[in-house]
């Protein structure tokens, strides 16, 4: 894949979030409620060490704000073993499915439950590494982590 990107070939990135299982009266009409996006463009490897470190910091801080300043920064060996790709987005496509099942008209009379089982991704209480030295508290950014920001 990295050779493909380095050669300047087009790339795509797909992200899908499943919001619910749609349970119809007929197995044929079972589905999922979801949000999906496909990005199309051309990628490039981020190679200069300073730019790569900056990209890793931005990514780390996006995932867990405050972590970059607390964690050990990547050493030379780790940086050399890590590839970072930037994608110049040329176009995008999104698709969303929401709502209840859509059954065949005659199936609405069946004595079979139908509906949606909502799903969500949820951050739970942090669990300390079993090898964590004693006396190191859970940092605020981990204790108060919220994926809805």
Regions found by a protein language model. Name each.
Residues 1-58:
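Short, structured beta-strand-loop surface elements
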Residues 47, 51-149:
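C-terminal edge-of-domain segments
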């Amino acid at each position: 894949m990295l050779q493909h990107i380095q050669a300047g070939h087009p790339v795509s990135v797909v992200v899908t979030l499943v919001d619910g299982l749609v349970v119809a009266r007929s197995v044929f009409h079972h589905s999922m409620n979801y949000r999906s996006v496909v990005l199309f463009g051309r990628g490039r490897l981020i190679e200069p060490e300073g730019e790569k470190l900056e990209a890793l910091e931005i990514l780390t801080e996006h995932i867990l704000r405050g972590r970059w300043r607390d964690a050990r920064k990547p050493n030379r060996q780790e940086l050399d073993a890590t590839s970072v790709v930037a994608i110049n987005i040329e176009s995008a496509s999104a698709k969303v499915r929401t709502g209840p099942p859509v059954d065949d008209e005659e199936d609405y009379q069946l004595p079979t439950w139908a509906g949606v089982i909502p799903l969500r991704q949820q951050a739970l209480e942090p669990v300390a590494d079993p090898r964590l030295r004693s006396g190191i508290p859970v940092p605020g950014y981990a204790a108060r982590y919220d994926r809805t920001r």
